């Protein structure tokens, strides 16, 4: 007997059986593994500047949510981290600054490691700031003004005849650039760079500002400093005399002159530092063995303003590892959909 479609009952049974089998196969298709990192350890590192601790914590938390066992982060100076990365002693960090760190990469970096993701695109600016009252009183526009005796005297806190600048500790990328600036702009006899611990030095500068004394410091964004000493309200960005790049800055000269910077003494302003990408940097072999982590690094990013807010909380005293982890938990709760979408992307890659 044939049906109205012309198929025999036997053929209809065969077709239905085939369709049922296809449904079963579809339902048995492997779902993305919720924990592709299960049984695998990750060895993170983090920078020696405390404003980078939040990024390490949030990226490590994401890896934990993928099932990885994340070891305690090693605090490493930039050159030591990059050498450790190519030596396969650590797997990643979320504290890459480029092009600032270009000169600190080992010769075999491209063979062994890679910039694996961008956390903040061209959002990290750096430069020199002076309290607004002094800018107006002395007509300060650039580093060159610190060659004037009355300016040096106002910023000389130890009586050595030089203006004191809160600079960067040895091993930081900015320390090399500041040293370069003082040399090429003939400022070594006029400015004393303070290279002690940055947070403590800036706390001293903040205390001087609150006592209505002049302050002169280097900083970067995101950073708690610009929350406590706000550009245009409390302090002003000043120029370098001319664009004179370090070896690692060559090719980025145009990016060292910025327009529309809030609190700049001029517009445009010669910052002396190009705007940097904050990046995840990882070992290539680690990424090859861990496609879920690789994809996670590619899709994750953190807004600059969120990093700055967290940094401000750290400076206010919430700076223990437990408190930083709590900041991560709170951030995830406020960005749950975005967080889950990143994890879903990573899980799909590992399927």
Residue map of PLM features:
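Short, well-ordered beta-strand elements
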Residues: 36-51, 68-74, 162-166, 297
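Pocket-flanking alpha-helical
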Residues: 56, 76-112, 204, 224-230
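A conserved helix-loop-strand patch within extracytoplasmic ligand-binding domains
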Residues: 113-167
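Short helix-initiation/N-cap motifs at beta->coil->alpha
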Residues: 49-50, 68-83, 193-204, 222-223
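C-terminal motif of bacterial Sec signal peptides marking the signal peptidase cleavage site
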Residues: 24-27
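Flexible, solvent-exposed loop/hinge segments that line or gate ligand/substrate-binding clefts
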Residues: 183-186, 194-308
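C-terminal functional modules
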Residues: 273, 286-287, 294-296, 300-351
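A bilobed periplasmic-binding-protein/Venus flytrap-type ligand-binding module shared by bacterial periplasmic
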Residues: 126-136, 277-289, 313
């Amino acid at each position: 007997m044939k049906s109205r479609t012309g198929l025999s009952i036997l053929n209809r049974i065969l077709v239905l059986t085939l369709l049922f089998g296809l449904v079963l196969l579809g339902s048995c298709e492997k779902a993305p593994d919720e924990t592709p990192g299960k049984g695998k350890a990750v060895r993170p590192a983090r920078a020696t500047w405390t404003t980078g601790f939040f990024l390490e914590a949030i990226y490590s938390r994401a890896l934990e949510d993928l099932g990885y066992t994340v070891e305690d982060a090693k605090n490493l100076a930039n050159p030591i981290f990059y050498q450790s990365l190519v030596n396969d002693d650590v797997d990643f960090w979320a504290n890459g600054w480029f092009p600032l760190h270009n000169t600190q990469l080992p010769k075999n970096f491209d063979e062994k490691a890679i910039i694996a993701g961008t956390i903040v695109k061209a959002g990290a600016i750096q430069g020199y700031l002076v309290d607004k009252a002094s800018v107006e009183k002395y007509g300060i526009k650039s580093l060159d003004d610190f060659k004037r005796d009355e300016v040096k005297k106002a910023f000389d806190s130890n009586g050595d005849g030089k203006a004191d600048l809160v600079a960067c500790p040895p091993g930081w990328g900015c320390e090399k650039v500041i040293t370069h600036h003082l040399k090429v702009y003939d400022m070594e006899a006029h400015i004393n760079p303070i290279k002690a611990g940055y947070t403590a030095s800036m706390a001293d500068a903040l205390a001087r500002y609150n006592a209505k004394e002049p302050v002169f410091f280097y900083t970067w964004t995101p950073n708690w400093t610009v929350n406590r000493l706000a550009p245009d309200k409390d302090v002003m960005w000043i120029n370098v005399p001319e664009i004179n790049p370090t070896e690692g800055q060559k090719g980025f000269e145009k990016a060292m002159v910025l327009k529309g910077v809030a609190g700049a003494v001029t517009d445009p302003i010669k910052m002396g530092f190009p705007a940097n990408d904050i990046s995840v940097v990882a070992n290539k072999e680690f990424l090859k063995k861990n496609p879920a982590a690789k994809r996670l690094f590619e899709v994750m990013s953190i807004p600059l303003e969120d990093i700055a807010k967290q940094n401000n909380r750290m400076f206010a005293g919430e700076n223990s590892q437990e408190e930083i982890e709590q900041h991560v938990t709170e951030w995830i709760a406020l960005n749950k959909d975005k967080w889950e979408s990143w994890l879903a992307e990573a899980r799909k890659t590992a399927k």
